[in-house]
Amino acid sequence: MQISLEELVKITGGELRGNKDFQITAPCSIDNPKEDAVCYFSDGSKAESISSIKAGCFILPSKIKETFKTDKNVIFADNPEWAFTLFLRHYDSSKPKFDRGVHPTAVIGKNVVLGNNITVGAYSVIEDDVTLGDNTVIYPHVYIGRRTFVGKDCILYPNVVVREECIIKDRVIIEAGATIGTDGFGFVLVNYKHEKIPQVGNVIIESDSEIGANTTIDRAKIDSTVIGVNVKVDNLTQLAHNVKVGQGSIIISQVGVAGSTEIGRGVVLAGQVGVAGHIKIGDGVQVGAQSGIMQDIPAGKKMFGTPVRDYMETLKLYAALPYLSEMVREFRKRKKTEENK
């Protein structure tokens, strides 16, 4: 790929200061600059360092435009990271990734509806009565169960499993090895024997969501496990049966959410958070890494720790821990003194 800075400005929406005909071929990082590549600084206070960085162009915050002086090629943008992201999308789309069409080794069942311009990779299995929307890409070794619906512009990477009767809406990305619609962990104890409860619901993943590699989302016991619009789920995450995740939430790696829990809109669960079942987490809640959530959390709270509590309160408790043994000794000493009076 090769584009001029004039074209790059059209992509990023920024304002150029420099040679509009200069050619860019790739993105680069600040730590590994290239003379024909573009990088960015989100923090304007660090922009002075570009004098020693040999990159072809820099995207910098608009707020420093009036005071910042340099002879380097610079694009000023209100949000440099977003401008750089727009360029990355353009760069990524220019690279060939797959051949359109159905590979001859793919297995296509009866009454399958294939949209326009789709891709089904080698050794993938599409069972009966499946619908695949326009421009959807199914990479090799993917399994899609009967009566499943996959919308437009979706990408399912290698070794993804989507079991029967699930609904994947438009522009959903499912990373390699993820499993959608596995049986929920449901058993009833009868005479000291765990009897399996059939899980007859499904999973619905709403539009513009992304599911990380090797993540598992269980089908509902009845009704649906629901992943809302524009939800981002990281790798190695477990979402149990009948969980509901609200629009725009982010769930980071190794989180486990037990059954029938409801997560509101715009929630952030950091890495390795554990969530008990049958609880409600309100809109906009943020929970720090490795926290244990065992009760409802009202909207807008920032929480941390196990058991989870107010973020600042937890930090104060952690700060006090190194002195706890000394405090206990002092308490016992004073108590003994009082008793001997």
UniProtKB/Swiss-Prot annotation:
Q: Which GO terms describe its molecular function?
A: N-acyltransferase activity
UniProt keyword annotations, A-Z: Acyltransferase, Lipid A biosynthesis, Lipid biosynthesis, Lipid metabolism, Repeat, Transferase
Write out the catalytic residues in the record: H241 (proton acceptor)
The answer to keyword Ubl conjugation applying to this record is no
InterPro entries assigned to the protein according to its UniProt record, in alphabetical order: Hexapep, Hexapep_transf_CS, LpxD, Trimer_LpxA-like_sf, UDP_GlcNAc_AcTrfase_non-rep
Query: What EC identifiers does the entry list?
Result: 2.3.1.191
Which residues are in coiled coils?
Answer: none
Disulphide bonds annotated for this chain are: none
Source organism, top-level taxon = Bacteria
The record ties this protein, via SUPFAM superfamilies, to:
Trimeric LpxA-like enzymes (SSF51161)
Q: Does the keyword ATP-binding apply?
A: no
Chain's role: Catalyzes the N-acylation of UDP-3-O-acylglucosamine using 3-hydroxyacyl-ACP as the acyl donor. Is involved in the biosynthesis of lipid A, a phosphorylated glycolipid that anchors the lipopolysaccharide to the outer membrane of the cell.
> Record's family?
Belongs to the transferase hexapeptide repeat family. LpxD subfamily.
Name-wise, this protein is UDP-3-O-acylglucosamine N-acyltransferase
